[in-house]
């Protein structure tokens, strides 16, 4: 039995309460949640299918199901009297509601579709299809608006459209539509927020906008008074400028009065603000110059705060702001009409195609659960409801859960300090409200339990994290105070290590270096310098030891023990990868960006664009200059000279017309290829066309031979996969595919480069802090800590906020001027604070990943000025004005006993009274760029020396007459013959059917087979009978696409096939060859029933595995070490508790019931499939079947 802490045991045992478990990082929340579920099953005798367990990703749901299954199996091994009950839970586990909120909504909608009149056969729309549908709906809407010529619409276009087009306004409609989907009733919310713009000066004082502005000003004025009090203290020190006291006290009095006026109407505050004046400082010649300057600077900062309020908030009077809002009201109302108009058009397009998107699922679910009878059904069905990662919920998900919970059966677990998904519209205030209002006593109907013990990290790491966040995190910044309840406490014991656990490396960007390499210094990017310094630190780390708990020994650190965490991987990850590779450090970047920037992807997309339309200069020249076109720069110039003004394709046509030379022949051949590919693109599926193009051009193999070839080929396969997804939509053709990809690029939908390494490879991982959430590593290097925060969320023309609504700029069309409305000003402040709060929580996530060591690295400029700011940063206002993570870290460290390096830079004193007792241990280093730059300089000198030797190379010095002793060796090498001639005729890749042919003596037909392309379009083919292979393909296709919850009868299956015909997935002729009765028999067979009852079913799963050629093809030499790729497609496999079951469909005719000979024929194929599946999934294939449709029978291998 596990030894649970008192708090963990309380979370496991508590009943009769809604529980909020505030689980700190590394506190074992998932283990507690699983144990609570097991105890409910054991002690409360409640079946697992009477529980609703909500997670936020499918992967998390799968992991939760596996954990629960493992825990149940572990209990069964104890051989208690509850074994039968536990066995029942194993059987029920597949139908248990362990799910995401979207999957739960799918179940609700499918069960109760009649309540909202939605097609029960709906499917989830692919991102490709829905993106294009949104674009179409928007274009139709705007075309209709232009035809309607409504004056307010044109004013809206003028105010929020671009200078030459209306794209910004279209983007705004999409932005508002997307944003309001996080509200339970989107259009109602939007209408209410638009109504806020119609108000009087009396309403203005009570508006959320003014309350937000006042709250922000309150913090600013407190900051100003703190600065003035510090300035006054310095003025009163011995040697200080006493004559400054009068002016400083005057400022303090006026600002104190201004602060008090915040409780009055905003017009009164505005009057007080405009009456503030600052007295001139009296001369103080005999004062200490340092103290005088310090006191004056502090006062100037305080004056700057007042100036900021005047210049950036109250640029006009409150009455003028009210007038602005009233003028904006009709524009915002028309924006509301555009959004609702778009919503209805988009909804109709989805309905026409029988699809829904994820937002629909949530809102359909809400609409259905608003029905009391349905809500009561779910309240009775679920004895307990569990919500994991509750801090990432939004108000829609909260409303869904609240509608099906009872008064005391909700269990919510999470950590608001790790709420880092604001960009997905997560709302941490839901967690915070409960955190602050729930009681802590046993028996409270709403009860909070804190899990504060951390079982992941060393005490030294925890002490440092606690010190930092106690200093910087607060209710105002971070949205939760870091008090004793939020602090981390060590829960696990660790063996001691020699090296310090927390290290801070500050890289100063502007340290002095030798003049002769100053230019090189400028060329070396800041990111690259940081990456190189970290690379060297990693090499040093490999000489250090950590304690391996699993093997109970000290061991050297390995690459895979180290992770580099970045706030953003864009631009940064690639620089780090290159620096690590240069230093011989194997590395892997887990990034979601950089895909479209990959040269091979950009090049191939240009080829597709040119095939679609040759009159595009940049893509055309790009393709011609590439290995596909093989034109030289000189040839491209010669072509352009023929027509300097037209398109480049015009110049090509004129060159062909005027010239008779080799370049003309080359151009004619190139254009013929483009025309040929253009014709093929019209009648070949886009995914097949892309793959054929990769093979025809040899481009796939070309990039494979480049540095990083495997990665580049994987990137091209992603494009092929994306085309396969596109092909499944109702939108077809090369033009539409290109349009979709461009839309994806324009909407920042970068897919990220392909991933070719696994988690067990011995490499240093480079990932974003977001990706690291939930993970742990022995050593964490938090890099890029000096990078400025990205607060561009506040720069848009119209801001959006869940509480404050719409925040547009005000445009005066008569004066052609604009300014921020008070709504936008309020929102800018609020969004900035919320963004900074999330940045602080992101920092918390990063610093709570390490087990043994945390290394913090950041670059900065003008460190002498920064340390002054850090030393003065002792209030919320200062921390809110931080520009980077280093500003927070530095502000805490400069006051720490180990921050002497920083204090020395500014000659600051240590506040021994306040911070001496602090026991966390930090190592602070200030590094320069000199070493990196000097190393680069020496490297370039060596390269120049090598080039010089090559330039003056003398062939005579290496004449064979002078080196006859090498003649025999040269002859041997030139006359060498390859010892494995068999390897030269073995293909690099074989399908499973090819292997069967090879072993039947048909190798020649495989080696020399040439794929042919039938160029006759389908509409010219005429009618002809389908071959047996084609009939088999159709049946496989139908089995792949059938909705498995609607296969109980011939009627249900026939309806689905008719739908496939309607959507042009198959033709009517193809549908007629499908024997529906045979398919029904399959689903009613023993193996079919098992498949339908399985938790996870996978259909038509392609694979490629590497095998030794001699193990695959009979008769090859035992000495042959050649490898080949085996590819195939597994018809179906499904998961059961104790392994995988593989099923392969066959339409072979069975003579006299002789199924054994059929099995013998396909034995090798099934063996290959099973091996591939085990290698891919890491799970055991326990059973393998052929399903023979001819005799309606499943045959086990």
Curated annotation (Swiss-Prot):
Q: Which UniProt keywords apply?
A: ATP-binding, DNA damage, DNA repair, DNA-binding, Exonuclease, Helicase, Hydrolase, Isomerase, Nuclease, Nucleotide-binding
Can you give the residue ranges of the UvrD-like helicase C-terminal domain?
485-774
Question: Mind listing the GO biological process terms from this record?
Answer: double-strand break repair via homologous recombination
Molecular function (GO) terms listed?
Answer: 3'-5' DNA helicase activity; 3'-5' exonuclease activity; ATP binding; ATP hydrolysis activity; double-stranded DNA binding
Q: Which cofactors? A: Mg(2+)
User: Pfam families from the entry?
Assistant: PDDEXK_1 (PF12705), UvrD-helicase (PF00580), UvrD_C (PF13361)
What reaction gets catalysed by this protein? Couples ATP hydrolysis with the unwinding of duplex DNA by translocating in the 3'-5' direction; ATP + H2O = ADP + phosphate + H(+)
What Gene3D superfamilies does this protein's entry cite? 3.90.320.10, P-loop containing nucleotide triphosphate hydrolases (3.40.50.300)
Transcription regulation among the record's keywords? no
Q: Which PROSITE patterns match?
A: UVRD_HELICASE_ATP_BIND (PS51198), UVRD_HELICASE_CTER (PS51217)
Where is it found, in Gene Ontology cellular component terms? cytosol; DNA helicase complex
Q: Which residues form the UvrD-like helicase ATP-binding domain?
A: 2-458
Q: Which InterPro entries match?
A: AddA, DNA_helicase_UvrD-like_C, DNA_helicase_UvrD/REP, P-loop_NTPase, PDDEXK-like_dom_sf, PDDEXK_AddAB-type, Restrct_endonuc-II-like, UvrD-like_ATP-bd
Q: Where does ATP bind?
A: 23-30
UniProt EC number: 3.1.-.-, 5.6.2.4
Q: Which domain of life is it from?
A: Bacteria
What does the subunit section of this Swiss-Prot or TrEMBL entry state?
A: Heterodimer of AddA and AddB/RexB.
Q: Which family does the UniProt entry place this protein in?
A: Belongs to the helicase family. AddA subfamily.
Q: What does this protein do?
A: The heterodimer acts as both an ATP-dependent DNA helicase and an ATP-dependent, dual-direction single-stranded exonuclease. Recognizes the chi site generating a DNA molecule suitable for the initiation of homologous recombination. The AddA nuclease domain is required for chi fragment generation; this subunit has the helicase and 3' -> 5' nuclease activities.
Its name, as the record gives it, is: ATP-dependent helicase/nuclease subunit A
